Amino acid sequence: MSYEYSEKKIVAVLASNLEAGIALNVIGHLAVSMGAYADEDIMGRKVLTDNSGIDHTGISKYPFIITKVKPSRLKRLVDDARQEESLLLVDYPKQMLTTGHDDELAEEIAKVDNANIEYLGAVIYGDSKIVSELTGKFTLWK
């Protein structure tokens, strides 16, 4: 498998005011969604076999960086990323914390104008240059 490792990247951006437990929940949901909707090109080898013959499920072949920004900056990022059609954007609205079933979430989101949605996180995948232009000045999550 030959490819350019730095050609594309994945950047998760979390609201800087999240507690660690909520941040982990947000990133978990975002990562599952990203994996489900990304093209097959995002994945490296399906299986990695160790020296003992044990198979390990493969992971993304591109860098996955986790950052944080103020909630207002996160909102602008989501809006800006939506303008770049070549990017895959997955967002996590605050309503996901107060709803259970997917149908409940759909009902709650349908009641809110985009201008009033508060995002707790987002993941962007695509061309490294474009993703870096949008997220390059953000603080790494530590």
Question: What feature does the model see in each segment?
Answer:
Residues 1-142:
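Positively charged, small/polar-rich N-terminal and surface patches that mediate targeting and assembly
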